[in-house]
Amino acid sequence: AAGSAVAMSSGTLEAISGEETDFEITLHNFGNTIASDVMAELSSPSGHITLHDAMISVGDINPGSDETVVFPVYVHGTAFYMEDLDLKLTISDAEGNTWVNAVPVNVEGPYLMVDDYAGDIYPGSNTEFILNLENQGSRSLSSYSLELLPYDNLVSIYSDPTSLSELSVGENIYLDDFEIGFSSDIINGSVLPM
């Protein structure tokens, strides 16, 4: 079939949690006619990224040719190691063609995981909850605050948020500052998010 066919031809992009960066994306016209007045729009439903200039006018792309577009972005410090930013690149031209590409991004950052916990967790109990957390990411974690959140009327939290000043990659930290209450309405064996 004759016509233009524009798609992203660059590979996986790299980003660091908590930093500004430019995503350089190469577009290639795989078709056999000129793609006229090409527009490229980068989008994401993620709350962990801010797109500063999401729509870029590319102009014309000849058959077999490349054009590079640069999207300035900020990846928030809340983005963790290998976070899926769910980026999508929508390319359109003057002829009404539209092409949609998934944009893969490797995010470098901390990744805080619960390694272990201790405390009496049963319906109707109030307990001092102890957490062992490990940074399993690719970057140190610094100046974070950790807060356990209540769940419906089933889990109550009686403690203030805890601050973490620094946690290097592979390091653990024990936190024993959490007072938690569990409703007597909880059924044994229930799984509750926290």
Question: Which role fits each region the language model picked out?
Answer:
Residues E20, N32-V38, W99, N126, ...:
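Short acidic/proline- and small/hydrophobic-mixed sequence motifs that coincide with surface turns
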Residues T50-A79, S156-I186:
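Intrinsically disordered, low-complexity Pro/Gly/Ser/Thr-rich segments with frequent PxxP/GP/PP motifs
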Residues T21, E67, L85, T127-F129, ...:
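Hydrophobic core residues within well-ordered beta-strands of beta-rich domains
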Residues S44-T50, G109-Y111, P150-S156:
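Short, solvent-exposed loop/linker segments at beta-strand-coil boundaries, enriched for Pro/Gly
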Residues A1, Y74-Y111, G181-M194:
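Terminal connector regions
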Residues L13-E19, G119-S125:
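Short, solvent-exposed loop/linker segments at the N-terminal edge
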Residues L27-G31, N132-G137:
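Asparagine-centered strand-capping/turn motif at beta-strand->loop junctions
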Residues S43-S44, S57-G59, V73, D86-N97, ...:
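Enriched for extracellular/lumenal, surface-exposed ectodomains of secreted and cell-surface proteins
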